[in-house]
Amino acid sequence: MQPISPDGSLSPWEPGMFSLAVYAVLVAAFVAVQLFVAWWLGERKPGVEKARPYECGIIPTGSARLRYPVPFYLVAIFFLIFDMEGAYILTWAVAFEELGWAGWLQMSFFIGLLLVGLVYVWKKGGLDWRPSYGKK
């Protein structure tokens, strides 16, 4: 099946596909033009001053490359995990009446599994902020 027939008309489903293809080409062209303009107008020779970190107009004192403590990463990962779980629970709450008791049982199992995971992380010390040398 050809997108455009010999008489110049489109089949019923093909105008949407044709519009999608035209849109994709236009977006790709726009992105390419923006990247080219940024490259063309951009700084060619960055010096030491340009590479220095900017701290609100104040001359930096010390290195800007500091290491973050690992608990911050762990809290971020736990937040993402439990945030996604919250999204699942919210969608379940919206469709609660249609799902009935079967959906309630499935969500209860899901929440129970989440609680088991939270207790596991807690017991392994993932929520403890003390330094590792001070743990008992």
Swiss-Prot record:
It is an enzyme of class 7 (translocase). Its EC number is 7.1.1.-. One of its GO terms (molecular function) is quinone binding. NDH-1 shuttles electrons from NADH, via FMN and iron-sulfur (Fe-S) centers, to quinones in the respiratory chain. The immediate electron acceptor for the enzyme in this species is believed to be ubiquinone. Couples the redox reaction to proton translocation (for every two electrons transferred, four hydrogen ions are translocated across the cytoplasmic membrane), and thus conserves the redox energy in a proton gradient. The gene is nuoA. It catalyses: a quinone + NADH + 5 H(+)(in) = a quinol + NAD(+) + 4 H(+)(out). It is a multi-pass membrane protein. Pfam families: Oxidored_q4 (PF00507). Keywords: Cell inner membrane, Cell membrane, Membrane, NAD, Quinone, Translocase, Transmembrane, Transmembrane helix, Transport, Ubiquinone. One of its GO terms (cellular component) is NADH dehydrogenase complex. The chain crosses the membrane at residues 20-40, 70-90, 99-119. NDH-1 is composed of 14 different subunits. Subunits NuoA, H, J, K, L, M, N constitute the membrane sector of the complex. Belongs to the complex I subunit 3 family. It is found in: Cell inner membrane. This is NADH-quinone oxidoreductase subunit A.
